[in-house]
Amino acid sequence: MPLARYAVYRGGPQIWVAPTADDSDGWLASMRHIAIESGAFVVTVPQFIPSDAFPDDFPVPLPPDKQVFGRGGAAVIEPSSGEVIAGPLYNGEGIVVADCDLRRGLHAKRWFDSVGHYSREDALARETANLTEPAE
């Protein structure tokens, strides 16, 4: 994924939206890293899935003692420091709101330019496939 992220970073995103099924603490740490690395606000939206969200005729038996299958963890992360500025919202439905001053992202990109001089294109060669052609 680092090369895929690098390709997106080159476009200069200001807000990175990351939906996922991963509700682990490791995911939140990853999103904090991506905020700093990309210089973009990160809005992460892990799934909150209570057991009553499944229909009675769901084809796979669910463990009767498990009440939540995805605890959520929606959060907004600031790009300069990786600080969580809203959320995380666990174990319930809700709306996570943050005031995102996009100038902070521009400042973060000037401080840590992951696709500029830090990327060292003079020292590293990379090649990406032309995705408009069918795979062989």
Stretches with model-predicted labels:
Residues 105-136:
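Cysteine/selenocysteine-centered motifs that mediate thiol-based redox chemistry or coordinate metal-sulfur cofactors
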Residues 92-111:
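A short, polar/charged loop-to-alpha-helix boundary motif
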Residues 1-96:
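CN hydrolase (nitrilase-like) catalytic-core segments centered on the catalytic cysteine
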